[in-house]
A protein has these predicted regions:
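GHKL-type ATPase core
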Residues: 2-9, 67-89, 100-221
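Conserved helix-loop functional segments at active or binding sites
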Residues: 19-22, 26, 49, 53, ...
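Short, surface-exposed helix-loop/turn micro-motifs enriched in polar/charged residues
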Residues: 28-31, 35-36, 51, 106-109, ...
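Conserved ATP-binding N-box helix of the HATPase_c
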Residues: 34-57, 118-125
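Long, structured ligand/cofactor-binding scaffold of large enzymes
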Residues: 47, 52, 64-66, 71-73
Length: 221
């Protein structure tokens, strides 16, 4: 039943994103190292919500050479169907504060992160953010720059890159140096948080890679 309920209609819209870039500390606690890493935690926590709902078993977290971070899960994929607001539900999740499945009680009984709220905050505080949603046999794609959508919707829906048998969501983003004091993620803090998350969720596997050095560090929790 829950699988059918988690769709475009599960996204509830409350307000816009304007305040996030002006007062980021209200949403992520600050613009230092902890606030920077908090961007990753928000996306990971959304994937953990999928795990708690019974769908996601693996999360991959990569720190890329260009300073960006990639988070991928094998959950159901963010809803991409047409929302009553006239656009893809994914677009609402990433551009509207407080648009997320968490605010519709039918989709999740438990919720770890801001869920949806977190996605839009990460988007607003990133130089760019790229989304791929694997859902219903297709790879749906979207891209943003400082929170602004860069791709034109086709009849309100996302462009499709191709077909896939996988399900899940892949998000890659580059933190905005106009917002943060520094944009170099702390691998030590991140590894500690991922280890704790995996410990609290025994059936969840988390893969971590730090690709920024000469040799890639790989860990599985």
């Amino acid at each position: 039943m829950a699988k059918e309920q988690y769709n475009a209609d599960s996204i509830t819209v409350l307000e816009g994103l304007e305040a996030v870039r002006k007062r980021p500390g209200m949403y992520i606690g600050g613009v230092g190292s902890k606030g920077l890493n908090h961007l990753i935690y928000e996306i990971v926590d959304n994937a953990v919500d999928e795990h708690l709902a019974g769908y996601c078993t693996e999360i991959e977290v990569y720190l890329e050479k260009d300073g960006s971070a990639t988070i991928e899960d094998n959950g159901r994929g963010i809803p991409v169907g047409m929302h009553e607001k006239g656009m893809s539900a994914e677009r609402l999740v990433f551009t509207t504060l407080h648009a997320g499945g968490k605010f519709d009680d039918s989709a999740y009984k438990t919720s770890g992160g801001l869920h949806g709220v977190g996605s839009s905050v990460v988007n607003a505080l990133s130089t760019w953010l790229d989304v791929q949603v694997m859902r219903e046999g297709k790879i749906h794609h979207d891209r943003y720059e400082r929170g602004v959508p860069m791709l034109e919707l086709e009849d309100g829906l996302l462009p499709v890159l191709g077909k896939t048998k996988k399900t899940g969501t892949r998000i890659q983003f580059l933190p905005d140096p106009e917002i943060f004091e520094k944009t170099w993620f702390s691998a030590t803090e991140l590894k500690s948080r991922l280890h704790e998350t995996a410990y609290l969720n025994p059936e969840l596997t988390i893969h971590f890679e730090d690709r920024r050095g000469e040799e890639t560090e790989k860990l599985t929790y």
